[in-house]
């Protein structure tokens, strides 16, 4: 969750300092954040069944 907060703050800083017309960096960071988020979701989907096998309720 920390990477998400850092990327959000960095994106806001770049959006304010660069402006809307030159916000290429913001788009790149948004794509990176989306890719990281999707990778994290996929990782949780893979790990959850293994966790249930190791630590049953």
From Swiss-Prot:
Q: List the record's Gene Ontology CC terms alphabetically.
A: extracellular region
Q: Where in the cell is it found?
A: Secreted
Secretion signal: which residues? 1-23
User: Which terms does the UniProt entry file under GO BP?
Assistant: defense response to Gram-positive bacterium; innate immune response; male-specific antibacterial humoral response
Q: Which domain of life is it from?
A: Eukaryota
Q: In which tissues is it expressed?
A: Ejaculatory duct of adult males.
Which factors induce or repress this protein, as stated in its UniProt record? In response to mating.
Keywords from the UniProt entry: Antibiotic, Antimicrobial, Immunity, Innate immunity, Secreted, Signal
What does this protein do, in the record's words?
Answer: Male-specific peptide with moderate activity against Gram-positive bacteria.
In the record, the note on similarity to other proteins reads: Belongs to the andropin family.
Full protein name:
Andropin
Native organism: Drosophila yakuba (Fruit fly)
């Amino acid at each position: 969750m920390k990477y998400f907060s850092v990327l959000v703050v960095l994106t806001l800083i770049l959006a304010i300092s660069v402006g809307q017309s030159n916000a290429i960096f913001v788009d790149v960071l948004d794509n990176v954040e989306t890719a990281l988020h999707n990778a994290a979701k996929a990782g949780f989907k893979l790990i959850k069944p293994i966790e249930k096998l190791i630590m049953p309720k």
